[in-house]
Amino acid sequence: MNEEILQMMNIYNTFNFDWMGDEIKTPSDLTRHHIKKKQHDGENNINNYALLTTNSHHLIHYLEVNYNKEYNLINKLLLELNESKKEPTEEYFLEMKKILKIVKKDIKNKKRKRK
């Protein structure tokens, strides 16, 4: 396992759910998401990473392209969590869930309309 991921798992007590609330089935499923993009001078270290499962990582990049407002709200939450150096709180996950619920509902409706 990547040393930075392991270090972050311990700092943020991230063993059951990633930072977007997705269940961690195996630690090897965790990835490092750059909160501030490298091409926008984002650091390549734990001060700029969010711990996301592969599924969440794909989702956040989908949101970046298709739901920019929600992507920015989520990235703001990720940054605040990163800077706190503490484990995600219940309030944090509730806020994340609220944003994701809106997006997932819209995605589901769009899929229905295509059928």
What are these regions (language model features)?
Residues 78-115:
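Short flanking/linker segments adjacent to small metal-binding domains or redox-active Cys/His motifs
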Residues 1-31, 53-55, 60:
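Short cysteine-rich loop/turn motifs with clustered Cys
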Residues 1-5, 70-74, 90-96:
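Short amphipathic alpha-helical segments that mediate assembly, nucleic-acid/protein binding
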Residues 40-59:
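Short beta-strand-alpha-helix junction that forms the catalytic/metal-binding core
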Residues 34-41, 67-75:
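Short cysteine/histidine-rich metal-coordination sites, predominantly Zn2+-binding motifs
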Residues 14, 31, 47-49, 77-79:
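Residues that flank catalytic or metal-binding motifs in active/ligand-binding sites
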